[in-house]
Amino acid sequence: MIIKDIVIGHLSVPLKKPFKTAVRSVNSVNDVVVKIITDTGNVGFGSAASTGLVTGDITESIEGAINNYIKRSIVGMDIEDFEAILIKLDNCIVGNTSAKAAVDIALYDLYGQRYGAPLYKLLGGFRNKLETDITISVNSPEEMSRDSVDAVKLGYKTLKIKVGKNPKLDIKRMREIRKAIGYEVNLRIDANQGWQPKEAIRALNEIENEGLKIELVEQPVKAWNLEGLKMVTDNVNIPVMADESVFSPKDAARVMEMRACDLINIKLMKTGGIHNALKICALAEVYGMECMLGCMLEGKVSVTAAVHLAAAKRIITKIDLDGPVLCSRDDVVGGAMYDNSNIVLVDEPGLGIEGINN
């Protein structure tokens, strides 16, 4: 199965409602879609999200990295030489993790097709069903409460609440949400780097003292501030998860060695794809640190790849793969099957994606 070409397209899907965090507001999913064409007629699908404020990657840079560096490095190679292809992918250009992720995902799709097995089984096969949380965007406490109630009515058992703009207002948001939904639903909070270490400690301890029952807090401080992250971890009882602080396996090893956090959020757009995400999973097993598999605001192609990885590995105990359910429609034929919070993988080779209607 020889790689003959890499073709780039686009997937644009409006959201059901605007997606708001501490750093941005978005109205649609806009992915760069990759198809790897082979001499056998097999096609591998991958995609990448433009997330300039997180990864530094935008649509133009993703396309440029693929067309000008990645394509010329791996076209002509055989999928059976998989490790060699991944080494070329890693080394052909510095950074550009989203572009690398898109191609990596398509390569793994072909790898599964080559050996006639769904990807999650090749990667470990721990389970074939998952349950995701759903994100509640930053808005007024009243609107966030309404959105939370709506999500619970749809069967979601875990909500991820976006905070990080104003600690006092964030605490009010949590109070109003708990009042609206009760205590049977899990709440996670994601500050998206929005707090300073000391204010994070104050806010989280106040949340705990009020009995608001928070499962975890994600990236409370700036990504670069590992000492601040550790300070928060050491001074609160609510488990702290690193997100933007961990892109690479090297980043993961550093925060694990420091015990700067309690958990890690793995995202394929940060790691450069599945191959580096697997290395983080291996490190997490060694250090005994559970992981979440998360996504950016992505469509179903790349999220399906994340679902396969999450299903394969025991160390991935928390799932934040809600991108497809935030979209107003599904333009991807095949792939992971969503029923609100419930995700099921089909036993088709690779990712099980047949095409894209967009």
Curated annotation (Swiss-Prot):
Keywords, ordered alphabetically: Cell wall biogenesis/degradation, Isomerase, Magnesium, Metal-binding
Where Mg(2+) binds, per the record, is at 190, 218, 243
Which PROSITE patterns does the UniProt entry name for this protein? MR_MLE_1
Active-site residues (renumbered):
162, 267
EC identifiers of the protein = 5.1.1.20
Molecular function per GO? L-Ala-D/L-Glu epimerase activity; metal ion binding
Q: Which family does it belong to?
A: Belongs to the mandelate racemase/muconate lactonizing enzyme family.
**Per its record, how is this protein called by name?**
L-Ala-D/L-Glu epimerase
